[in-house]
From Swiss-Prot:
GO terms for cellular component: cytoplasm. Its cofactor is Mg(2+). It comes from Rickettsia massiliae (strain Mtu5). This is Ribonuclease H. Belongs to the RNase H family.
Length: 152
């Protein structure tokens, strides 16, 4: 496996659902890259998953990765729940469809390319990487809000 990359991800939403943004900070050696994006009508959980997905898509080769997220939903979903979802054809134990299955499936497809350790970090608790990812997610959310204002 290749180089070590540290990634911090976050999602933000104005309302749930509502306009939302995602952000990620990727750190490799002494360099870093910030990325963010938005959706005009989404949920906070979709933005959390999208942040991780888009960060992984930025990587051009196999890497050893530590991903830090303040979303228990993302961290638990990708490390614990997803195995049963796959076994149950993307249904939960009560036979209801898994929410956000489209994004979970895309994220799962990215996992095989890398060695990944998923870590939960408390949000808004003076972790510089998490703070940076949060700012990027808010930037995405604010972009979505401005676009919606322009549309009237």
């Amino acid at each position: 496996m290749g180089s070590k990359v540290v990634i911090y991800t976050d999602g933000a939403c104005a309302g749930n659902p509502g306009p939302g943004g995602w952000g990620a900070l990727l750190q490799f050696n002494d360099t870093s890259k910030e990325v963010f994006g938005y959706e005009l009508d989404t949920t906070n959980n979709r933005m959390e998953i999208t942040a991780a997905l888009e960060a992984l898509r930025m990587l051009k080769k196999s890497c050893n990765i530590e991903i830090y997220t303040d979303s228990k939903y993302l961290q638990q979903g990708i490390t614990a729940w997803i195995h049963n979802w796959i076994k149950n054809n993307w249904c939960k134990s009560n036979n209801e469809p898994v929410k956000n299955a489209d994004l979970w499936q895309k994220l799962y497809a990215e996992l095989s390319k890398h060695t990944i350790i998923w870590k939960w970090v408390k949000g808004h608790a003076n972790n510089s990487g998490n703070i940076a990812a949060d700012k990027l997610a808010v930037q995405g959310r604010e972009t979505a809000i401005e676009i919606l204002k322009c549309r009237g």
